[in-house]
Amino acid sequence: MKQRYHLLDMLRGICIILVVWYHVLYNLSEIFGGEYAFFRSVGMNNFRDGFVGVLMVLAGISCSLTRSNLRRGVRTLAGGLLITVVTAVAMPGQLITFGILHFFGCCMLLYAAAHRLLEKVPVALGAAVSFLLYFVTRNLYYAVTGVPHSFLLFALGFRTGHSSADYYPIIPWVFLFLAGGFLGRLFARGTVPDVFKQDPVPALSWLGRHTMIIYLLHQPVVYGVMVLWFSLIK
């Protein structure tokens, strides 16, 4: 029987709550025209990148703990493409062409293809270099100009004229994912502290085990509730 690291589930549950909270604020500010100056502040952007970055690392760890990354990658990428279709039809002004699910799906497929090669790299070296590369490349989108108009380059992280309401390009985020993949080998070996096996808040752990379905459903539900609310108060 595989060991379940409940603390990872709990951290993932906290992050998905923050994702939902962020999208509530996004809807209020960007769709319903609310005036929330703090939403566009540097502090808010850094906070968002912080909890999303934790999700990236956790996703990489999960890839080290399963052999079904090809199947998971295809399923996750399909979820991203579904979001593209739904936003194109229902909310073309908020079209998502390469969001977080597209990113996760691509990374899982890349990990499935390259995991044997990655396993030859020592954990500490791989994690350290991955974190370093994330910080070195995190402003790539703004630093490089004159890139050809290519969706592939846009997905990689270059400014090409394409746009996406939710945008998590391969570079720099893949390096946090890879850092998690390296750290995940410690979990796979069972060499992490026992605290990771504890389940102090089962409700949060449950949320963390169902992040995909929550992510797919939360925005339609949140948006629908807001439309109903604002129609009633008017």
Positions of the model-derived regions?
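Alpha-helical transmembrane segments and their immediate juxtamembrane cytosolic regions
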Residues: M1-K234
